[in-house]
Amino acid sequence: MTTHQESVDVLAIGAHPDDVELGCGGLLAKLSSEGKRIAILDLTRGELSTRGTPNERHAESEHAAAILGLCARENAGLPDGGLSNTPEQRLAVIPFIRRFRPKVVLTLMTPDRHPDHEAAHYLGRDACF
């Protein structure tokens, strides 16, 4: 997916490809249909998943981006199974937020039984300063 040149209305941050779609895909589709500029930041490639290889998940995420009408979708390349709200990982997320300049940031809900989902929530929240 090509990246954008302007700020976005909404940046949705998920731990793995498909997290954002499962959590708020309907909302993003609605906002996109209303002309809002929407972007997704996947923090990992989902490389530890038992539901497809990283390449398959990437292809699925590109297909989902087209369906949702996203203006951009990026991947931070952080380790699947190793997300943590550390200064180092926040520093990996901050450049995306600065580049997208979103009006609204959506993250995963907390509490969550998956530690990467919980960490994604706090990383997204704390990287917005």
Where are these regions (language model features)?
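Active-site rim/loop-helix segments in enzyme catalytic domains that contact anionic ligands
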Residues: 1-100
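Active-site adenylate/phosphate-handling loop in enzymes that bind or generate adenylated species
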Residues: 96-129
